[in-house]
Amino acid sequence: MLKIFICEDNKDQRQSIERIVKNYLMMVDLDARLELSTDLPNDILKWRTQEQHDYLFLLDIELNHEMNGIILASQLRESYPHAKIVFITSHTEMAFLSFA
């Protein structure tokens, strides 16, 4: 099963991403679910499981928090080395940070 996580501090953006993910999952035959959608990076870091799954993290780069999406991704990578991480931003100048 693919477990999907969203971390976006803008409520409207987060709800839009949730709708896109849920609509896509309804259209395709994929063993996946939206596990958690939050504005707090620590909510994602607290979530732990011993079960083996595939993980997809959709992370805003610039969060209204002491931890940004890049730092969150590096911490997630330690626990989930094979997870897929997608950075989301509406700031074009921030987009290149994900390739550093």
Q: Where would I find each of the regions flagged by the language model?
A:
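Non-catalytic signal-transmission and effector/linker regions of two-component phosphorelay proteins
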Residues: 1-5, 15-18
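A structural signal for isolated positions on well-ordered beta-strands in alpha/beta enzyme cores
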Residues: 3-5, 33-35, 86
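Conserved acidic carboxylate
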Residues: 8
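Charged phosphotransfer/docking patches of two-component systems
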Residues: 11-18, 95
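Acidic, metal-coordinating helix/loop segments flanking the phosphotransfer/catalytic sites
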Residues: 15-18, 33-56
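Short catalytic helix/loop segments, enriched in acidic residues and glycine
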Residues: 21
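A generic structural motif
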Residues: 25-36, 53, 81-83
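CheY-like receiver
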Residues: 54-100
